[in-house]
Amino acid sequence: MIALAEECFISQIAEIEKAAFSDAWSEKSLESALLDETGIFLAEVDGGEVRGYIIGSCDGFSGYIERIAVSAAHRKNGIGKQLLSAFENALPETAESISLEVRASNSPAIGLYGSFGFERAGVRRNMYSSPKEDGIVMIKKVIK
């Protein structure tokens, strides 16, 4: 079930974060995101186990996905698409688009985003470190 993330899940989310990203956010950063009233922080939880999460924001017109990850044990089960859909549904009626950046080498994520309607909009050179890599900017129009 996907719902608003809760503080009791932060340690599990941090473990997924560490496994998914070389520049993982700390538990403190995740807690700050949870407390951000302008943010959207959702988690997919089954029987008390966090299987994935998505963190983003919206300025009223543009949604932005900062982080999305699914635990390795639960990938390829549609959880990523469910999280993207839940994020889009959490946006206000005024939202017109969603954007995100993804490592150029992350083909599985690029494929997921493309299957959800995101299109490549540009490249941010050397956006990532550890290892140094370009970021692909992807945007999806929101139709409500």
What are these regions (language model features)?
Residues 91-101:
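Conserved GNAT acetyl-CoA-binding A-motif
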Residues 99-101, 119-136:
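Conserved catalytic-core motifs of GNAT/GCN5-like acyltransferases
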Residues 37, 61, 106, 128-134:
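Short acidic/glycine-enriched loop/turn segments that link adjacent beta-strands
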Residues 4-73, 81-90, 141-144:
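Acetyl-CoA-dependent GNAT
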Residues 67, 71-85, 103-111, 115-116:
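Conserved glycine-rich acetyl-CoA-binding loop
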Residues 26, 107-110, 114-126:
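K/E-rich alpha-helical interaction surfaces of small helical-bundle regulatory domains
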